[in-house]
Regions:
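Helix-start (N-cap) detector for alpha-helical repeat units in TPR-like alpha-solenoids
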Residues: 37, 71-72, 105-106, 138-139
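Canonical tetratricopeptide repeat
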Residues: 76, 110, 144-147
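Canonical positions in the second alpha-helix
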Residues: 62-63, 96-97, 130-131
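Structural marker of alpha-solenoid helical repeat scaffolds
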Residues: 66, 100, 133-134
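Alpha-helical segment of the N-proximal tetratricopeptide repeat
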Residues: 35-66
Length: 160
């Protein structure tokens, strides 16, 4: 009887571990450790800090070419395209980031800002609703909520 219970306990423990791993992975919003090791990713971040959007686009294109599943790089590629006013390219990059990680807070926020810049408030509100479910008290949620609340069609939005 004890042998049966011990076997059952071990089996349940292994099953719990197997099921827990995907949940942890789905809850991981970024690839920070991996990105630190990518020179072009760092170059892209420096280009964004310097507002050199063309260089940022070039850098992040290289990152996603080498690592197409890097949601962070797709997100920052979208951000850089958006800063250049290339909204179709920006939305395509955000869509890729969100296909990889549907809970990517940065991509949800930045795409929402892009929708506001292109006078698509309903789409921005949809991104905001997703953010509220993921993390109601996060800075990304607060930032997009403020922008949506202050939105006036045709107004210039100061954030990139």
């Amino acid at each position: 009887m004890q042998k049966f219970n011990l076997s059952r306990l071990i089996a349940l423990s292994l099953l719990s571990l197997a099921l827990a791993n995907p949940v942890l992975a789905a809850d991981t919003p970024t690839m920070t450790e991996e990105n630190v090791k990518i020179d072009e990713y760092a170059a892209g971040q420096k280009a964004i800090a310097a507002k050199n959007w063309t260089l940022a686009v070039s850098s992040f294109k290289k990152v996603v070419a080498d690592n197409p599943k890097n949601a962070d790089a797709h997100n920052l590629l979208g951000y850089s395209h958006r800063a250049l006013g290339k909204f179709d390219d920006a939305f395509a990059a955000y869509d890729k980031a969100l296909a990889i990680d549907p809970k990517h807070k940065g991509a949800l926020e930045y795409s929402g800002m892009g929708y506001l810049k292109t006078n698509q408030k309903a789409k921005a509100e949809a991104q905001l609703a997703k953010l509220k479910v993921i993390c109601a008290s996060c800075s990304e949620t607060a930032s997009l909520a403020k922008a949506v609340a202050e939105f006036k069609p045709g107004a210039v939005i100061s954030t990139y």
